[in-house]
Regions:
Chain B
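Helix-loop-helix "hairpin" substructures at the membrane interface of multi-pass membrane proteins
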Residues: 21, 160-240, 245, 264-270
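Single transmembrane alpha-helix segments in multi-pass membrane proteins
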Residues: 10-60, 94, 98-112, 203, ...
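Inter-helical junctions in multi-pass inner-membrane proteins, predominant
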Residues: 5-24, 185-190, 216-262, 279-289, ...
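Membrane-interfacial amphipathic/re-entrant helices at transmembrane-helix boundaries
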Residues: 1-28, 56, 67-79, 106-111, ...
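Membrane-embedded helix boundary and interhelical linker motif in transport proteins
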Residues: 16, 39, 45-94, 158-161, ...
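Transmembrane helix-bundle core of multi-pass membrane transporters
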Residues: 102-103, 111-188, 215, 283-312, ...
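Hydrophobic alpha-helical transmembrane segments of polytopic membrane proteins
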Residues: 88-90, 250-274, 315-325, 330
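Alpha-helical transmembrane segments within multi-pass membrane transporters and channels
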Residues: 68-120, 269-273, 278, 323-327
């Protein structure tokens, strides 16, 4: 069996799994096309995130554990781009907020300039401290009242600065840009140091981004969530009241409710597939180009690459920004799919470390591997819970009814997820470190 | 009198909590830094090792409470602590044998170790959630306060009260004892010296006949003990929730790096630097300023520099500043 054959079969396996999910309710399958499409859609998004991580880790050997933060920035972009404009917010405090943020940024820039251009010494430290402290207080003095007045506007529904009222599809590239900006800032500081430091710095920035999203109510309503974001596809309810749609559904012999939900989800699946294929093609082209070969040369031996005149830190920064931008796009797509922004649901185990499991299992350095890993691991992430419950029912079947241990085991079965994912990661790292579809 | 009140308020809200939190961070950072110095990787599973140790201790505490065993005014968890340490040592040694040793023999790159520690983190997190669940667990008992706000006010006649929780006093005392024993061990005993030698120069240590597997084994035992103690103290002081322990990873890493990775003294200093920065920056200074400034200068707002939700941002900002200006940390660590 050739390599290509084997790899195709792996993809076919994932496809069959998702088809089975739709067709049969045998064992852990649910037999619902809706659930199959939900898995497929999130699988496609996970595959895109995995491509982003693969670009960073597989091409360049950068260890980014802040994927959650970039994903969340993508989600924020959806809110900022697609929600309707709130003129009252802009007239009351929006402008001051922007001014305050610009002021804050200027303070930081001034501080950087001072450290760059003044000779080191006590005077520099003093000037630096004065600039930073004064900047901070000016920033708070403009910022606090503006935030108060923005948050006071219709707080039950809005209370934030609103968006630009643009089509939601524009939010996807915007999400990428936002994530790229954050990645540039973090890469500028942490790249060029030891590899562990980038890991810790990205871990930190992700936590901070989530903290900002949770607490800055003027931005995206914080934990009050933004719901009912605009969608690129029609609402199920509208489809069900559309006579021509109902008629067509009837001609297929499906009831209109199922037909409308499946129609919308399939529409998303189509859109996500288009994005995935486009990104996959670009990643593949990049990998094959001289640029991709240079990246892999840097990854394999930094010293040698540097001796050949390659600017390692700059190239690292470039690829770090690119990979993070892809994660941002995926994050924006995910928020569009949910049509709501809920900062409370971002959890590093699910949004950062799970993606890493996908990349490692799929095969780091190979874009097709990343896609396969994304789809496969997502399927298992969803299905480990019913599998765990099945297993626990089997284990506890001999125990007395109503025993405390049995109840505890059955109740805890849902926590099997993390354990299983850790086990899969360790087993792959140990016995097949190159993953299912190894790098060529 | 007003100045005295300001001082008491400062002690009550900043110094005492800062000392307790700093001791917890220092103990956690010591574990991270020891692993870094001897096994040469950043152990992402450390937070979950702490959670595991705390969990075992909690289970024993509940057992002791149910048979009526107690430590009088002190929390029962102190009696259960040795068992928690033993359990965590067992887990750490099994993990090393089954997981890390393979990569050590392969001489894998540090970043592979970090990735492996991610897998270990997942599994430990899963085990803890599986056994005790993801929810909040309180296991503090015994006397609640060494000195409560009301008694303090009565004793001194001041307006401001000073409350010191038993757990806070206990945390600081335990941390001092543990650190003293650790430094005695590292500096005076044969095993401790071989550990430091191995950390300084692996090849030279091997040449002089030090058994690396023994060094690694002792390191894991010490780290497991430190992690358990830190985890239990944190749990006693606040409360036990698996996810909080995972989130502690960031301030702990920040402490270790700020002090200089691989340097035990740096880890302790870093722990207190991070803790006090977090507390002072997120504390609302209104009360202290009202007491210490004349009325005309008294502030209107809360004078809180950042809301408490941003305490991660504080440790992170310090981390970034140190990385930018002094990547080896304040106390000269090993990493560049």
């Amino acid at each position: 069996m050739t390599e290509t054959m084997k790899h195709t079969l792996l993809f076919v396996f994932v496809g069959v799994m998702i088809l089975l999910e739709g067709m049969t309710d045998f064992l852990f399958f649910s037999g619902s096309w809706n659930s199959a499409l939900v898995i497929l859609n999130m699988g496609l998004i996970s595959a895109i995130m995995a491509i982003g991580v693969n670009i960073q880790w597989g091409f360049a050997g950068l260890f980014n554990v802040g994927i959650m933060g970039f994903t969340a920035l993508g989600g924020l972009a959806v809110v900022l781009v697609s929600t309707p404009v709130i003129p009252a917010a802009w007239s009351s405090g929006g402008v001051s907020i922007v001014m305050a943020l610009v002021m804050g940024a200027l303070t930081v820039v001034a501080a950087v300039m001072i450290t760059k251009f003044m000779p080191a010494g006590k005077l520099r430290a003093l000037v630096l401290a004065v600039v930073l402290i004064a900047g901070f207080f000016v920033y708070r003095a403009i910022f606090d009242p503006a935030v108060g007045s923005v948050e006071a506007i219709n707080p039950a529904l809005q209370g934030n600065i609103g968006g630009l009222g643009l089509p939601v599809l524009l939010a996807w590239p915007a999400g990428g840009l936002l994530a790229a900006g954050a990645a540039w800032l973090i890469g500028k500081t942490a790249l060029g140091l030891r590899s562990d430091y980038l890991a810790i710095a990205t871990l930190g920035i992700a936590e901070i981004i989530i903290a900002v999203l949770k607490n800055e109510d003027w931005l995206s309503r914080g934990v009050k969530n933004v719901v009912g974001l605009p969608r690129p596809l029609p609402y199920e309810v509208d489809l069900q009241s559309d006579p021509s749609f109902v008629e067509r559904a009837a001609s297929w012999g499906i009831d209109p409710v199922t037909a409308s939900t499946v129609y919308v989800k399939a529409g998303y699946a189509l859109m996500f597939t288009v994005v995935l294929l486009a990104l996959l093609w670009m990643a593949q082209m990049a990998l094959k180009s001289p640029w991709g070969r240079m990246m892999r040369a840097i990854r394999d031996n930094e010293t040698a690459a540097e001796a050949m005149g390659k600017d390692v830190t700059r190239r690292h920064l470039q690829i770090f920004v690119l990979g993070s931008a892809i994660c941002g796009i995926a994050g924006a797509m995910m928020t569009t799919l949910d049509s709501q922004m809920t900062p409370g649901t971002y959890n590093p185990l699910r949004f950062t470390f799970l993606i890493w499991v996908m990349v490692i299992v799929g095969g780091s350095g190979n874009n097709f591997g990343a896609v396969l890993g994304g789809m496969l691991i997502w399927f298992f992430w969803i299905k480990v819970e019913p599998m765990g419950i099945l297993l626990m029912e089997l284990v506890t079947s001999g125990m007395a009814e109503g025993s405390a241990l049995k109840a505890h085991l059955l109740e805890s079965a849902s926590h099997m997820r993390l354990f299983t994912m850790g086990l899969i990661l360790l087993l792959v790292l140990r016995f097949s470190p190159r993953g299912l579809i190894p790098e060529k | 009198m007003d100045l005295l009140n300001a001082l008491v308020a400062l002690t009550n809200f900043v110094i005492v909590p800062g000392l307790a939190y700093g001791s917890q961070l220092a103990l956690g950072a010591l574990g991270v830094t020891l692993i870094y110095g001897i096994l040469r990787f950043s152990n992402f599973a450390h937070g979950d090792t702490m959670a595991f140790g705390a969990m075992v201790t909690i289970l024993f505490t509940w057992l002791f409470q149910s048979v009526g065993l107690s430590a009088g005014p002190l929390p029962t968890a102190l009696l259960a602590l040795p068992f928690g340490i033993l359990g965590t040592i067992a887990l750490a040694l099994v993990t090393d044998r089954t997981v890390y040793r393979f990569y050590r023999q392969q001489k894998a790159k540090p970043v592979i170790f970090v990735m492996v520690s991610l897998g270990v983190m997942f599994m430990m997190n899963g085990i803890v959630r599986f056994i005790i669940g993801p929810g909040d667990q309180r296991f503090t008992d015994g006397e609640r306060f060494v000195i409560s706000a009301r008694t303090f006010k009565k004793l001194t006649g001041l307006q401001e009260g000073l409350a010191i929780k038993t757990t806070e006093a206990l945390t600081v005392i335990t941390a001092v004892i543990v650190v003293a024993v650790l430094f005695w061990f590292l500096n005076k005993t044969r095993t401790g010296k071989s550990m430091r030698a191995y950390s300084d120069n692996e090849d030279l240590a091997l040449l002089s006949g030090i058994n690396p597997e023994r060094v690694v084994m002792y390191t894991w035992m010490i780290v497991a003990a430190l992690a358990t103690i830190a985890g239990v103290l944190y749990g006693l002081d606040k409360s036990f929730k698996p996810f909080t322990y995972f989130q502690l990873l960031l301030p702990i890493f920040a402490s270790a790096i700020v002090g200089g990775l691989g340097n035990p003294i740096g880890a302790i200093a870093g722990g207190f630097i991070i803790a006090f920065s977090e507390v002072t920056i997120t504390y609302a200074w209104k009360k202290v300023l009202n007491y210490s400034l004349p009325d005309s200068l008294a502030p209107d707002g809360l004078v809180q520099l950042l809301s408490t939700d941003y305490k991660f941002a504080v440790s992170f900002a310090i981390l970034i500043v140190v990385l930018l200006f002094k990547p080896t940390g304040l106390f000269k660590g090993k990493a560049v």
